[in-house]
């Protein structure tokens, strides 16, 4: 790739000290790389590469993120109106908090002047020790970035306090607004922008902007992989292969129907306990969370310790599965797996272990068996991270409303299922800093490849949900 007007930036320090940036050269460099970026956008990354035709829409617009967070605009406007009404009814609340904010800004300016004069002063505010966005030394040692960081933290504290200390007529409105404020706060973090993140700026200078070119290519690949899902890679998918370095415990499929497949694992011992163990994983992810690798495998531990282990693997629903509901997943899923495990092992009873929504399904199965004349072959039941009481299920309730559910049902009517990638995106925005913006910075701005992480490989290997099942889940639970 040829570069025009390439200039060397003055750099008196091998560590690319940001305090000594040649801003004239930097301006020329970014103008040059903007032209390169536009070449990529237009499909001409190099003279030897012909633009590739694609029916996929490449442009990402702000409304895509907006609709992903909340497909019903009424919800946000209701929250804004409720918050605005609260401020007008209680001007003392805004006055007190804005007064504190102004005091902190004055202190921050004094801090800035004192530090510039080589005086030793303590920062006005520090990030949470668990906040990795500002872990780089430059955020504290470089006065410019230190000021930006503290100004951001002071301002976000103001916003959070206004919401937290406000008394809303409807408590749900407060929770909604807290959620939306969190999304805005994380999105506007100075760590998410080239010129306000010291690590990105240093790398851009050092590499002549090539990190941004690689970052755009990473974005393009993500968008081609999952168009219109605003998907971002969290791990190197090519580094993992089922049966090779993921899900390596030996076993075989002994039963299958249109709901699930049942895996029976090979015994490593001469003798086994009489009662087998049947594992029920969540039906929104793949089965191998219980068998990630040899060092992180519950299944391997079980078979090595004389447990006769069975594991359900839910089939990935398609349009033909639209009418499958909880009754099918109970009768043709869990109950059928219990029967097969008992028959295969010769035991009249089976122990059950469940994870996440697999535990929710197990609790429903147990209630179903208690209220029917069906034979109950459950000896014991264990639940890992399973939600049973849905009275308060945290930030997930931000996505649950009549408008939201109706919108989802309209989408499902067209295809017969809910796309698991949409559900995965929802979970990412429950922890936007760790599961979304962290990867925007690493993949798109620093131009790095994501690291190899087997658990994130599993987390991104999502499955679809049948139309009836998901609709019943949203409305009934």
Which ranges hold each PLM region?
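Flexible loop/turn segments at secondary-structure boundaries
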Residues: 270-271, 284-288, 317-322, 357-363, ...
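Amphipathic alpha-helical
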Residues: 226-237, 459, 463, 467-472, ...
